[in-house]
Structures are given as C-alpha cells and as structure tokens.
Amino acid sequence: MAPKKSTTKTTSKGKKPATSKGKEKSTSKAAIKKTTAKKEEASSKSYRELIIEGLTALKERKGSSRPALKKFIKENYPIVGSASNFDLYFNNAIKKGVEAGDFEQPKGPAGAVKLAKKKSPEVKKEKEVSPKPKQAATSVSATASKAKAASTKLAPKKVVKKKSPTVTAKKASSPSSLTYKEMILKSMPQLNDGKGSSRIVLKKYVKDTFSSKLKTSSNFDYLFNSAIKKCVENGELVQPKGPSGIIKLNKKKVKLST
C-alpha cells in the first residue's frame, strides 16, 4: 500500500480579498458626476426654457398655475429653486415670455400660464403672369390703332352746325332752371286773383306746381322763407300786417307775363 500524500492548503500571498471601500468610492464618484451634470444642465437652461419644460411636462389643458410650475422646477432643479432671487427671475421670465408671444395668460397676470400657439406663416401666392395674353393685347391694340388711322384718313370733315335760338330759349324758360324767388312770383297772381295769400297757401301751391322741379326737399322751408324775405326787402312783395300776415305782390314793381 502506498502512503497517502499529505495535502496542504496554500494561499496566494500576493492577492488580497476585495473590500467594500472600493465599491463605496465608485458609487460616490458616480453620484458626484450625476450632481455635477445636473448642475451644468440647470445652469445652461434659462428660466424661460425651464417654464416651457414644466408646461410640456404638466400637460394641463387650461394651463398651469405659477405654484405648480415653481414646484416642478424646484423638484427637478433644486439648485435653481433654492436660489434667493428665484421668484423674481421666475416672474420676469413669465412676463417677458408673454410679451414675446411664447406664453399666454387668458385670465390675466394672476391666472394660469399656457404655451402660445405659434401661427404658421402665411405663404403669399405669387400671381402667375402669362405673357401670351399681353402679346394678344398688344396685337389687338396695334390693329385698333391701324383701324383708327384708316378711319381718320377716310372720314370726311364734320360740318359744325349752329345752335338754333329756339332751343336756347326753351332751355332758359324751362321750369327746372327757376329759382325759389321766380316760383313764388309766378305763383302769386294765380292765388286769390292776385289779391294776396297766406304763407301756408303759397307754400302748398309752390310745392304742388313745381314738385317735380324742386331739387331739394329737405331744406325747402328754409329756401322758401329766405326767398320771401329777399322779395320783401327788394320791394317785389309786400306784407302789410307784418311777417306773419298775408303776402301781396307789388304790381307796380313786378311785371310778370302769366
């Protein structure tokens, strides 16, 4: 029988067992990296960008209140939220965002904040200019000018006829050219056998007789009364009982062919 070999456990002197200190160091380094990255991220963003991020994250249809937005920033960016002048910068960012058109406050400055809907720029359609119609127009104008030139050559000289005096006389005596004074003086002999008439009766007669020839009816009374006043001043009409009395025709001064 061969003797049993004695087995002895040998331990490696050079290698040391791993301790928990190395793990703690690695985790602390990772945490420091995360915090520094978050600090850099928060410092690189403006308050306006943080508010926009909060509005998109909260997704409230009617907008988010200021306290809700402040809470979001303080929870996600505690370094920014812990600043002493946080409220001042926060409110200024909202005010400038509203002025710039980035935010909306439908219920006023104390109301909720919403992201403004950006209007899509309207693209102006350029009018298509077709050169063909212009050429056609120029050709038509050229033919028209040629036709005019031909007509001017062939057309005989026009004989200017003198106007007949009867036409001018008719135009002068037409009722459309009568003044209020002339209408009143023509109406006076027809009323009460020329013995005089009241202002109301005379006015009615003038309206009925010259109704189609009166250009203005809105200021008829004013023009009628001013015409009577001028006739009285000129001596063509007489008012024996004063301005409110009857009106008579001064036959000595006025000679009318009825």
Curated annotation (Swiss-Prot):
Keyword Repeat: yes
Biased composition (Basic residues): 155-164
Subcellular location: Nucleus; Chromosome
A Gene Ontology term for the protein's cellular component: nucleosome
Keywords assigned by UniProt, alphabetized: Chromosome, DNA-binding, Nucleus, Phosphoprotein, Repeat
Keyword hit for Ion transport: no
Domain H15: start-end pairs: 43-117, 176-251
Disordered: annotated segments: 1-44, 101-171
Example GO BP: regulation of double-strand break repair
Residue numbers bearing the Phosphoserine modification: 174
Biased composition (Basic and acidic residues): 119-131
Broad class of where this protein is predominantly found: nucleus
Recorded superkingdom: Eukaryota
Family: Belongs to the histone H1/H5 family.
Function: Could act as an H1-type linker histone. Has been shown to bind DNA.
Further facts: Present with 6560 molecules/cell in log phase SD medium.
Protein known as: Histone H1
Phylogenetic lineage: Eukaryota, Fungi, Dikarya, Ascomycota, Saccharomycotina
